[in-house]
Amino acid sequence: MGRVSGRSCIVTGAAQGIGRAIGEALLDEGADVCFADINESKVAAVAEASQDRAAAGGGRVTHSPVDVTDRATVQAMIAHTVDAFGKLDVKFNNAGVNKPMNFLDVTEDNWNFIMGVNGLGCLIGMQEAARQFIRQGTFGKIVNTASVASRQGYDNVAPYCASKWGVVALTQSGARDLAKHDITVTGFAPGVVATEMWEQVDRDLMDIGAAQHPGQAMEEFSSVILKGRVATPADVTGTTTFLASQESDYMTGQIVMIDGGMTLV
């Protein structure tokens, strides 16, 4: 029996990168998983590719489109998951975006885009998951994706840093407010992870003149990682599966750093 057998989970931002890896790792440990993403065709393909993995782990898999900034689509995603699996136990608020800009060039549009997905999207996801847990009258878990950028600010990504500090605040505030409903709220903070999102960030930094060649940003960040390398999504999923499992049922309000030693807190 797997570590999360019988638990019904939603993972947003699951069409690629960390989100996809979280969902696949949950399937390996017996969970029922809804992969959700704004890119419906891509997340549908991920769910289809995960069918054999689900069967091997003893769980089930489905998918749902979602715009995490649109409450109606978040509600529809949760309803679909409950229809498919009979309940919801764990909600991963993982969808996130970044768009580097020099500090003096940050626009209202840039700020609102990043804060919308990373901040408001996290809030809506937490609220709607909590409402479902309360309707069920069951214990529930909310797991939020923060970042190493939630512990200190970095140049050229000020709105992203602010949004991830916001995720930490939402995690702590939600943990306090929702404890009376037997709902826990935790999070994890990855450092530099080799994903499609980081590849795009690398290109964006070159576009604004903050990097001169491909891979420069990742090289500079990795130079201060005590483990001596950037992470892969697989480096993150041991912790995320733990946060979804009964092994972490007594944890709430905490953010777990998974950054290879970039920050020591």
Give the location of each predicted region.
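Conserved glycine-rich Rossmann-like NAD(P)H-binding loop of the short-chain dehydrogenase/reductase
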Residues: E29-V46
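Active-site loop immediately N-terminal to the catalytic Tyr-X3-Lys motif
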Residues: M101-L104, Q152-A158, K180-H181, G228, ...
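Substrate-binding pocket helix/loop in short-chain dehydrogenase/reductase
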Residues: N102-F103, N110-N112, F221
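C-terminal substrate-recognition "lid" of short-chain dehydrogenase/reductases
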Residues: L123, R229-I258, T263-L264
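Residue(s) in the substrate-gating loop at a strand-loop-helix junction
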Residues: S147
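Short, small/polar-rich loop/turn modules that mediate ligand/substrate recognition or access, typified
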Residues: A179, T184, M251-G253
